[in-house]
């Protein structure tokens, strides 16, 4: 179990990982069983780019709207019939939360009858084996992979295999989906699945496709890494005209779409992550009529995507106007304007800008000016103790960068002149080393004068201030007489010791004076 959790954690982007944790915590607090399902599991196992997060709950996800919004998610749309929430999680992460359900089709082309189900029953209603897997995100079973149709084996074999015989009858949009997956992954369609597709074409089941399914397929084109290739494959299979009868590759701005993909890759390398989906739809439908575009927009379930697509040109024109005005009169002001603008607008404007001044400023923003950013005077800043540990460091570094952009700092002298007032005060000098020997004793005596009073008691008092004697300990009434100090021995030639005399009692008697008590 832990292996799939580990694989998930290393395959998700940091923002996607945060999104999984956000949904997981909300579901856990509500006591709802949660699974990561569908395309997300397929892409985690296969190694393809994880485009969005698909969650399935055993319960009603519509009841989680307030909690999800409070946690930071944006509700892009809600489908009451399918009990599905379309979310935009922090970091522009797309996600869906659907209820585990059974779909029973009573008639071709009619919406299914929906009823609650377990996660295994939910997996049985899906389209292809590679999409019929679920990963538990619940305590006690977290990391458990449910794969009742051996989808992991088909991923390893790189095959598109339908789940059951009536898959294309129940939901004709799966015909378009099969072609889209085969084109995206460059995987072949399994033989029996291919035979069922041909049978569905002969019976013209595609005419029963619902508007909801058409809208979902149009939306999915916006998220493809190579949408032009997908559109060409759909046109070859006669599926593109199903999405719109007037749509063809001739209506696509192929050059603009190619430049968009290239520019997005360049922005990704610089650390930017713009969402290209509104611009992708713009170029895919560049030569379609206004009515056709309006009809397509009505069918797309994510209304935030529709709004972004609709406002794309107007917002780009507004940004271009600001780039040619006083707000962008200097390089530093232009940098500030483009840094604060929506990344999607900058991406789209770089591809579509017609004014040379606008195009050049965006080009400088991603090119020449970033080279200036690499020339911050780090040596001078370090000399003045202006380091990243300072709370003010980001602002100081930004201010220096702005001055460098505008050409106001040239020499080392100018740089130091600007930085010195911003430098922190020098640190205090280090404490002196500890004193040793007589100096240490003298210092100790100065610190504790009472300790040196006693030795001075026997000496004459100095003419200075009198020193109070230390209190003496109480003396006992009878004190043994202290022995006299021994006399210093004279340095004479050694003499023979006199023989000792003994008394009658046998005790030795010292010759001469009475022996001193030692």
Language model: regions and residue ranges:
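Catalytic cores of the polymerase beta-like nucleotidyltransferase superfamily
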Residues: 1-518
């Amino acid at each position: 179990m832990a292996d799939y959790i580990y694989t998930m954690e290393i395959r998700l982007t940091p923002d996607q990982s945060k999104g999984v944790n956000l949904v997981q915590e909300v579901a856990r607090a509500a006591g709802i069983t949660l699974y990561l399902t569908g395309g997300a599991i397929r892409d985690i196992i296969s190694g393809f780019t994880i485009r969005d997060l698909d969650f399935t709950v055993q319960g009603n996800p519509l009841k989680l709207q307030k909690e999800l919004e409070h946690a930071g998610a944006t509700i892009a749309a809600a489908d009451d019939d399918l009990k599905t929430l379309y979310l935009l999680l922090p970091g522009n992460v797309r996600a869906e939360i659907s209820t585990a359900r059974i779909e029973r089709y009573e008639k071709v082309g009619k919406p299914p009858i929906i009823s609650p189900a377990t996660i295994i029953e939910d997996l049985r209603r899906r389209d292809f084996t590679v999409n019929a897997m679920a990963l538990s995100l619940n305590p006690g079973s977290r990391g458990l992979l449910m794969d009742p149709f051996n989808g992991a084996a088909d991923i390893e074999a790189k095959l598109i295999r339908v789940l059951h015989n009536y898959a294309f009858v129940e939901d004709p949009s799966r015909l378009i989906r099969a072609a889209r997956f085969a084109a995206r992954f460059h995987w072949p369609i399994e033989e029996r699945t291919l035979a069922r597709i041909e049978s569905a074409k002969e019976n013209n089941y595609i005419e029963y496709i619902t508007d909801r399914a058409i809208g979902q397929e149009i939306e999915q084109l916006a998220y493809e890494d190579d949408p032009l290739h997908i559109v060409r494959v759909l046109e070859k299979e006669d599926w593109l005209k199903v999405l719109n009868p007037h749509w063809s590759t001739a209506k696509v701005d192929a050059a603009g779409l190619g430049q968009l993909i290239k520019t997005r890759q360049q922005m990704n390398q610089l650390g930017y992550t713009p969402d290209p989906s509104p611009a992708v739809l713009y170029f895919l439908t560049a030569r379609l009529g206004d009515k056709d575009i309006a009809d397509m927009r009505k069918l797309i379930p994510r209304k935030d995507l529709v709004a972004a697509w609709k406002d794309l040109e107007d917002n780009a024109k507004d940004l271009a106007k600001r780039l040619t005005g006083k707000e962008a009169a200097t390089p530093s002001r232009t940098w500030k304007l483009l840094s604060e603008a929506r990344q999607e607008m900058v991406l789209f404007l770089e591809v579509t800008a017609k004014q040379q001044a606008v195009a050049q400023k965006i080009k400088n923003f991603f090119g020449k000016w970033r080279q200036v950013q690499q020339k911050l005077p780090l040596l001078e800043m370090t000399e003045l103790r202006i380091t990243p540990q300072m709370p003010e460091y980001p602002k100081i570094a930004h201010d220096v960068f702005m001055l460098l952009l505008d050409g106001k700092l040239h020499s080392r002298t100018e740089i130091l002149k600007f930085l010195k007032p911003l430098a922190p005060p020098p640190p205090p000098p280090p404490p002196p080393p500890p004193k040793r020997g007589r100096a240490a004793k003298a210092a100790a005596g100065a610190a504790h004068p009472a300790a040196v009073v006693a030795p001075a008691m026997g000496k004459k008092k100095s003419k200075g201030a009198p020193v109070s004697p230390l209190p003496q300990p109480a003396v006992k009434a009878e004190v043994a007489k202290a022995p006299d100090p021994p006399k210093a021995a004279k340095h004479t030639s050694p003499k023979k010791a006199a023989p000792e005399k003994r008394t009658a009692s046998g005790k030795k008697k010292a010759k001469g004076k009475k022996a001193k008590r030692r």
